[in-house]
Design a protein with these regions (language model features):
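Inter-motif core of Ras-like GTPase G domains
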Residues: 259-284, 298-307
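Conserved Switch II/interswitch segment of TRAFAC-class P-loop GTPases
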Residues: 271-294, 319-326
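Charged, amphipathic alpha-helical linker segments immediately N-terminal to NTP-binding catalytic cores
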Residues: 125-175
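Switch I (effector-binding) loop of TRAFAC-class P-loop GTPase G-domains
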Residues: 189-191, 213-243, 251-267
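N-terminal accessory targeting/assembly segments
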Residues: 1-127
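Conserved beta-strand/loop subsegment of P-loop NTPase cores
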Residues: 243, 273-280, 304-320, 343-350
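Canonical P-loop GTPase G-domain recognition
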Residues: 320-374
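Glycine-rich phosphate-binding P-loop
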Residues: 194-215, 228
Length: 374
């Protein structure tokens, strides 16, 4: 894998390299994982068996007599073995957990379980090995059979044993297939560009801001293993291209209110951002007061920013219709937050996502925090 080479050439292990390089490695891994998964097809056991059956029907004996029969039955066995091996070997191209970027790895760890995933791959590997053993064994039995009946009997037995290996893999194949399908969906954030994750209570203006700043209509993709979505806008600003990501329902409430799925989703999400943008809603229509919003901010600082060494940029949104009292309180709370988490917090910037007030200055600050393209 290319990224391992980079780390090795730098003479260091991945977690010891500089943060920017680590980010770069993660981004490249992320892309590699998705590119790889796109090219893999994970069949069900039933599909493999059915495919074998179709191909099997087309085989015809070429010679008469016992020698011809042996040759024919070996051909049939070989066909079954070859198909099973090829299909399963393709499945084994699924990346090992240790070769994955953190986002994808954590998704699997949280929603599937690391052991369950590795076990599935192990079973597939084992099935290939056993299939090979049956092929070796039964090929000899058929080749040395003393009658047409005996040749048939061994072929039946050999094919049966190989196909029963496949049938017993069914559960594991289904799991790998699901993992593949879920992770491939993350292609919209897997191009290797820097990521800014936007947080804030519902109606704070996250969607409005992302729509305003993205070059095209934001893309919506399923958040793997959940019924939630990831919304991604691509932002181009002064030579910098990055993603602005919204994850509705995940960074909108303090974490003690999260259900199990949201907690898992958050754990995976933690490794994604290069910076976090937190939006305060200071309008009279805000659905939560600013104390609540500050608690959410603090949660995000502790659970994402501090753990991953990324900054949180604070923007006070809806400045065009700000409620005076809420605005003043917000300044006070932010002051306190800055005292507590001085090195992590940037801002605040007053903006109106709707009217476009202050957004250029905000972008200027945001891009300073992102790894540069080159
Ligand atoms: N006046 C005003 N309204 C805004 C502003 N930003 C967003 N809104 C409105 O607030 C509502 C919720 O915005 P939305 O972007 O959907 O919030 P989200 O839930 O955080 O994605 C919408 O009606 C927006 O038009 C702003 O800067 N000023
Ligand atoms: Mg929204």
């Amino acid at each position: 894998m290319i990224v391992d080479k980079i780390a090795v050439e730098h003479g260091q292990e991945i977690d010891k390299v500089a943060p920017w390089l680590q980010r770069h490695i993660q981004a490249m891994r992320m892309r590699e994982v998705v590119e790889k998964l796109k090219k893999i097809y994970v069949p069900s056991a039933e599909e493999i068996v059915k495919y074998v059956g179709e191909r099997y029907k087309r085989l015809r004996p070429r010679r008469r007599g016992l020698a011809g029969r042996r040759e024919f039955e070996i051909k049939r066995l070989e066909l079954v073995y070859n198909i099973v091996r090829d299909k399963l070997q393709k499945v084994l191209e699924m990346p090992r957990l240790e070769a994955m970027d953190e986002f994808h790895r954590r998704l699997i760890e949280e929603f599937i379980g690391a052991e369950v995933y590795e076990e599935a791959l192990k079973r597939v590997r084992l099935a290939i090995k056993l299939a090979r053993r049956f092929w070796d064994e039964y090929r000899v039995l058929i080749a040395t059979s003393q009658s047409v009946e005996e040749a048939k009997k061994y072929r039946k037995e050999g094919c049966g044993r190989i196909l029963s290996l496949v049938r017993r893999l069914d559960k594991h194949l289904k799991l790998l297939r699901r993992v593949r399908e879920e992770l491939v969906q993350t292609h919209v954030v897997s191009e290797g560009l820097p990521v800014v994750v936007v947080a804030g209570i519902p109606s704070a203006g996250k969607s409005t801001l992302i729509s305003r700043l993205s070059t095209a209509k934001p893309e919506v993709a399923p958040y793997p293993f959940t019924t939630k979505n990831i919304i991604v806008g691509k932002v181009v600003f002064k030579n910098q291209i990055f993603y602005m990501v919204d994850t509705p329902g995940i960074l909108e409430r303090p974490m003690h209110q999260h259900n199990q799925i949201e907690r898992k989703a958050l754990v995976a999400l933690t490794s994604l951002p290069d910076a976090i943008l937190f939006l305060y809603d200071v309008s009279a229509e805000r659905v939560q007061d600013v104390v609540y919003q500050t608690r959410l901010l603090e949660d995000i600082i502790r659970n994402i920013a501090l753990k991953n060494g990324v900054k949180v940029v604070i923007a006070i949104n809806k400045i065009d219709v700000a409620d005076r009292e809420a605005l003043q309180k917000t300044y006070q709370y932010i002051e306190e937050i800055k005292k507590k988490y001085d090195s992590v917090v940037v801002g605040p910037y007053n903006i109106s996502a709707l009217k476009g007030i202050g957004v250029e200055q905000l972008l200027n600050e945001l891009i300073k925090l992102l790894p540069s393209k080159g």
